[in-house]
Amino acid sequence: MRLLMRDGKCNICGERVRMVRESLGLSQEALAARIQLNGHSLTQKAISRIEMGLRIVPDYEIPLFADALNVDPLWLIGLDPPQIHGGAK
C-alpha cells in the first residue's frame, strides 16, 4: 500500500487540532478522554502522532475531533464552512 503525503505529512488537520487543543488548555490526554467519553477509542499516543502529521486521520474521526474541540469539521480539514446565500423564491 502506498501512503500519500502532502508537505511531508499524513494528514491536513493535525496542526489545527494542536492549535485548538492548546488554546483550550487541554493536554493530549484530556483530548483523548473527551473523545473516549463519546465511546470512541483514541489514545494520547494516537493524538500525538496525528498532531505531528505521522498518522492518517480517517474521515470518520474528523467529527470526533470537531465535537471534542467544539469546531467546525470543515475547518479542521482546511475548508471554510459553506456559505449559504439566498435561496430560490
Where are these regions (language model features)?
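Short, charged recognition helix plus adjacent turn
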Residues: 1-8, 67, 74-89
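Residues that mark the N-terminal boundary/hinge immediately upstream of a DNA-recognition element
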Residues: 16, 27, 43, 58-61, ...
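Alpha-helical residues within the helix-turn-helix
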Residues: 22, 33, 67
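Short alpha-helical DNA-recognition segment
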Residues: 25-49
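Hydrophobic micro-packing sites on short alpha-helices
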Residues: 31, 61-66, 76-77
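Short, basic-rich loop-to-helix N-cap that marks the start of a DNA-contacting helix
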Residues: 45, 52-67, 83
